[in-house]
Curated annotation (Swiss-Prot):
One of its GO terms (cellular component) is cytoplasm. This is Queuosine-tRNA galactosyltransferase. Glycosyltransferase that specifically catalyzes galactosylation of cytoplasmic tRNA(Tyr) modified with queuosine at position 34 (queuosine(34)). Galactosylates the cyclopentene hydroxyl group of queuosine(34) in tRNA(Tyr) to form galactosyl-queuosine(34). Mannosylation of queuosine(34) in tRNA(Tyr) is required to slow-down elongation at cognate codons UAC and suppress stop codon readthrough, thereby regulating protein translation. Keywords: Cytoplasm, Glycosyltransferase, Transferase. It is an enzyme of class 2 (transferase).
Amino acid sequence: MPVFNASDWLDECLQAILEQDFQGRMELCVFDDGSTDGSRELVERWRPKFEDRGISVLISGHKSSSPRGVGYAKNQAVSQSSGRFLCFQDADDVMKPQRVRLQQEAAAANPTAIVGCKVCRVPEGSTGRYTRWINSLSAEQLLTQVYTSHGPTVIMPSWFCSRSWFEKVGQFHEGGKGVPEDLLFFYQSLRLGGLVLRVDECLLVYRYHEHAATHSVLEQTIWDLRVDFLQERVLSQWDSFTIWNAGKQGRKLYRSLRPDNQSKVKAFCDVDENKIKKGFYTYEESKERPKPKIPVLHFRNASPPFIVCVKLDMTDGVLEGNLHSLQLTEGVHYYHFN
């Protein structure tokens, strides 16, 4: 558990760890990343309660005025631990009593998996679309929807994995503020053939607040990582494809691709008659002469495979209905990138 100025939430967080119904051996490993609000001392005061329950507590940290970042703090907490399994916990979240038990069972049966869980959001209703997405992905979509702007298909504060798998994937990136260390680790795990699983119960109360480290990561940083991973994992396997969305997001994806993948784009497709009437998209920034012109078609006249650049859960089911009407299989005929 990395900690940075979390005194407002620590009592509730620590009480929940104490109430785990897991019967095996547990240890709590905390790294304090330079808190100035007494967080480290607060954790220290809980030590006797944990030791009474047979849970050893390891606390380390630094007093530097500049935090080293979430990735560094997580790595330090892991390095001082000794367990065969790692349960990641954010200091502002609250685990349900059965979390460690159920996720440990899943990780023991799947030692190369990152195991997540469903979450309950606090305050209720905050980030509604994101929370619905996290909790409703199918087992297949945990692997096919890894390219969307939502990030990892099981959220980092719910992660649980074997120590051996963590060590194989390698540590979290320690670039500090602004680095999506969870996404980088997640992608590396997938590259190595790792599984993604979710225990289908709400095992974590996931708190939304304006100080969360998530807010420090730039959208463009995430975009660049997603585009690179899409090109590496999907587009490298395709000879040609269609971008579903002739609007801003679709054109941005096209412009972000390497030239060899731009040349594979045979068309854009859309439902907007105005865009379709224009007939084509001209890539004005191209150094090629003549400049590339890509046809814009109605989706019914376009051919798969597709990269879909339309936001999920924003069209009242119209997008999903259109994809279904073409009898397409996600992960074969199309991938979401939105």
